[in-house]
A protein has these predicted regions:
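Class I SAM-dependent transferase core
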Residues: 1-70, 75, 105, 111-122
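Conserved SAM/SAH cofactor-binding pocket of Class I
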Residues: 60-143, 153
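Class I S-adenosylmethionine-dependent transferase superfamily signal
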Residues: 88, 156-163
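Short "lid" loop at the C-terminus of a central beta-strand within the Rossmann-like core
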Residues: 130, 148, 176-181
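A short, conserved alpha-helix within the catalytic core of class I
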Residues: 148-158
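Conserved beta-strand signature within the Rossmann-like core of class I S-adenosyl-L-methionine
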Residues: 164-179
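Active-site capping/gating segments
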Residues: 177-216
Length: 216
């Protein structure tokens, strides 16, 4: 068995609730990401051998917690190579996703991948989130290692509509690596919930990574 096939078997053990159709689409996405990453640095090239079990697994941990109703609207800020936005759009076809980045070449790549994956529930926008109108448009705003928690919170807090028909309630879902306590202490932000991803999937060896939910 080759290393790639072994990685997918491991992922299926970690996320057994995902359908075969979803896995096939996720495989197509990683193939496209590798294709583009050889031309444009979207993901650290030293991580490409562990793309599935490190970066994709990190994003897929959201599926352990996120239960959303049809037509939910989600914004992925600083999407880079489409993480976590594209995997989430694949896993939640009933929802509407906006993937946003300020760097033109990354937006071009993500647009290409969305088109080739035929993700009709996904739009891609170039720009900075703080320049968006102050409209409470989205049920959730997603981010992964974009900036510090206080800065991200200030950027997106006025973009989230109040509501509790989803689980968790509407708000910010931020994938954070490293210690977060000092950032929360100095900013006086109070998350609704913090999940340790290493405790959730110790076999994944994700390290000191967390999913932090702010209810708005």
């Amino acid at each position: 068995m080759n290393k790639s096939a072994d990685s997918w078997m491991i992922l299926k053990e970690w996320f057994p609730d995902l359908s075969d159709e979803t896995w096939e689409k996720l495989k197509q996405y990683t193939e496209l990401l590798r294709e583009w990453n050889a031309k444009i640095n979207l993901v650290s090239r030293k991580d490409m051998d562990r793309l599935e079990t490190k970066h994709l697994a990190h994003c897929l941990t959201l599926t352990k917690f996120l239960r959303i109703m049809p037509k939910a609207r989600l914004l992925d800020v600083g999407t880079g190579g489409g993480l976590p936005g594209i995997p989430m759009a694949i896993c939640y076809p009933q929802a509407k996703f906006t993937l946003m980045d300020s760097i033109g070449k990354k937006v071009m790549v993500v647009e290409d991948m969305v088109k080739r994956l035929e993700l009709s529930n996904t739009e891609v926008r170039r720009g900075r989130v703080e320049e968006l109108p102050k409209k409470k448009t989205y049920d959730f705003v997603l981010g992964r290692a974009v900036t510090s928690l206080p800065v991200f919170f200030q950027w997106v807090r006025d973009k989230v509509a109040k509501g509790s028909r989803h689980s968790p309630a509407n708000g910010i879902l931020y994938l954070k690596g490293g210690d977060y306590t000092e950032e929360l202490k100095t900013s006086k932000l109070t998350p609704a919930k913090i999940w340790s991803l290493d405790e959730l999937l110790p076999e994944a060896e994700l390290g000191e990574k967390y999913l932090i939910h702010f209810k708005l």
